[in-house]
Every structure is written in structure tokens, then in C-alpha cells.
Design a protein with these regions (language model features):
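Cell wall/extracellular polymer interaction/catalysis modules
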Residues: 1-88, 99-120
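Conserved "landmark" site that anchors the functional core of diverse proteins
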Residues: 95
Length: 120
């Protein structure tokens, strides 16, 4: 779990702070693909310190992580949503209150089960 220490208290003793310059590699051809990297990083990446609160807390699932396979897809994070009904780019998003509740209770190795979408 990663968190913004300038915005939220450490949600769990094992949570790691998101530092200035922390990035997440989404460059599938690079050796650091699907890993936390530091700026400057010349390949495709996502900034973990955002101006909005979406990444104030990030829970990292084991989807194609920590050993990434090219073509299997980027990491799936659990993070804060923009609001009800707003999609993510492949992650799982929660209200801030629900994310804080989850973050305060999970441990490394906690199993996350994502059910298939219900048919209309």
C-alpha cells in the first residue's frame, strides 16, 4: 500500500509513503515495467503524486505484479474514485471513506475478489 503522507495519516503500519518523484512504469518493453520507479524516468509512466486526491491511498493488487509479463496488462490499483459512476482506466475505485476503511483493515497478502459484472 502506498499513501500521501502530506494528505493522509499512515493507514497501516506497513504502508509506504509516496514521495515526490515517485512514478509507476507502464512501459511494457522496459525492465521496470509495472514497478515503482523514480523520476527522471525516460519511459512511459504514471505520476503517483497527483494534484487530485485519487492516489492519496493506493492498494496494489498482484495483477501482473511484482513479476510483470509483457502484454498481460498494467497493474490494477485500488484507489479513490472521482465520484459515483465515473469509470477508471482499469483500476478499482472507491469513495474515500470506503477506501480508508479497507486500507485500515487489509494486510499484505489479503485476497481481493472481483466478481464478474452482473448481466443487465
Amino acid at each position: 500500500m502506498l499513501y500521501r503522507p502530506d494528505r493522509v495519516m499512515r493507514p497501516a503500519p506497513w504502508a509506504e509513503p509516496i514521495r515526490v518523484g515517485d512514478l509507476w512504469s507502464d512501459a511494457s518493453g522496459d525492465a521496470a515495467y509495472n514497478q515503482l520507479v523514480r523520476a527522471p524516468y525516460p519511459h512511459s509512466h504514471e505520476r503517483l503524486r497527483r494534484s487530485d486526491p485519487l492516489y492519496d491511498i493506493i492498494l496494489i493488487t498482484n495483477w501482473n505484479y511484482p513479476v510483470a509479463e509483457t502484454g498481460k496488462g498494467s497493474a490494477i490499483f485500488l484507489h479513490q474514485w472521482r465520484g459515483p459512476g465515473y469509470p477508471t482506466a482499469g483500476c478499482i475505485a472507491f469513495s474515500r471513506a470506503n477506501l480508508m476503511w479497507i486500507a485500515s483493515r487489509v494486510e499484505p497478502g489479503t485476497r481481493v475478489i472481483v466478481p464478474e459484472a452482473l448481466a443487465d
